[in-house]
Swiss-Prot record:
It is found in: Nucleus envelope; Presynapse; Cell projection, Axon; Perikaryon. This is Protein rogdi homolog. Its main location: nucleus. InterPro entries: RAVE2/Rogdi (IPR028241). The keyword Nucleus applies. It comes from Bos taurus (Bovine). It comes from the Eukaryota. Monomer. Keywords: Acetylation, Cell projection, Cytoplasmic vesicle, Nucleus, Synapse. GO terms for cellular component: axon; dendrite; nuclear envelope; perikaryon; RAVE complex; synaptic vesicle. The keyword Acetylation applies. Belongs to the rogdi family. The modification N-acetylalanine is found at residue 2.
Length: 287
């Protein structure tokens, strides 16, 4: 019995030593690695005043789709804003070519990119507050930090992977509609958003439902992409989507950022798992 107790005490001493090493050394090594990765991620979101001199570089993205050539265009991205847009739309009925572009005095903020960058900055801030001089005293303290960092990273990733669901009246009321010169025809709606690593442009063609229409009017709810046949009210009119054209272009640095988010989340989870292993040995007290 004494031998068993001695072995148990020796085992506990070894585990306690391993846990102290984990708290004092490995945790900080992981935090350094996380900071390095997230700083690389933050560099992908190039913005004025981020330490580089001069204006943020402009990137041109040619929009296309393997399913249609009705819409062609180029969007110019500058940091988290669209600074230029040049779009050509071939009308299906008569092949008339419409051209519209951003007014020179206008930029359109891509809130998804701005929000993702802000969440990355918050994650870096949380990590920087626990520098090498900080001594973690409990595993629970590490878990709390990892949960907070993972929350920010998950929110950053979700802002890029989950575009907002908008109703057609919300799209119609958007300031984006008033960005163009010449003014968009009243039978067109435009939406721009990020989906994963892609910059997406959707053009909706509309037609007015006559008061004597036999169609059963059902206003469409919110959606990332509305389908032909979706209906809505705008002012005194009832409108229906007749055609939908979606084109997109890959933004390589957004793909990099998403990879950095995934790797960082995995590192956080691995550290949480290591900490949690010790809880099974000290289930009756804080670990």
């Amino acid at each position: 019995m004494a031998t068993v107790m001695a072995a148990t005490a020796a085992e506990r001493a070894v585990l306690e030593e391993e846990f102290r090493w984990l708290l004092h050394d490995e945790v900080h090594a992981v935090l350094r690695q996380l900071q390095d990765i997230l700083k690389e991620a933050s560099l992908r979101f190039t913005l004025p005043g981020s330490g580089t001199e001069g204006p943020t570089k402009q990137e041109n993205f040619i929009l296309g789709s393997c399913g249609t050539d009705q819409v062609k265009g180029v969007l110019t991205l500058q940091g988290d804003a669209l600074s230029q847009a040049d779009v050509n739309l071939k009308m299906p009925r008569n092949n008339q070519l419409l051209h519209f572009a951003f007014r020179e005095d206008k930029q359109w903020k891509l809130q998804q990119i701005q929000d993702a960058r802000n969440h990355v900055s918050q994650a870096i801030y949380l990590l920087a507050n626990r520098d090498e001089s900080y001594q973690f005293r409990t595993g629970a303290e590490v878990l709390k930090l990892m949960d907070a960092v993972m929350l920010q990273l998950t929110r950053a990733r979700n802002r890029l992977t989950t575009p907002a669901t908008l109703t057609l009246p919300e799209i119609a009321a958007s300031g984006l509609t008033r960005m163009f010169a010449p003014t968009l025809p009243s039978d067109l709606l435009v939406n721009v958003y990020i989906n994963l690593n892609k910059l997406c442009l959707t053009v909706y063609q509309l037609h007015t439902l006559q008061p004597n229409s036999t169609k059963n009017f059902r206003p469409a709810g919110g959606a990332v992409l509305h389908s032909p046949g979706a209906m809505f009210e705008w002012g005194t009119q009832r409108l229906e989507v007749s055609h939908v054209h979606k084109v997109e272009s890959v933004i390589p640095w957004l793909n990099d950022a998403l990879v950095f988010f995934t790797v960082s989340l995995q590192l956080c989870q691995q550290l949480k798992d290591k900490i949690s292993v010790f809880s099974s040995y000290w289930s009756c007290r804080p670990f």
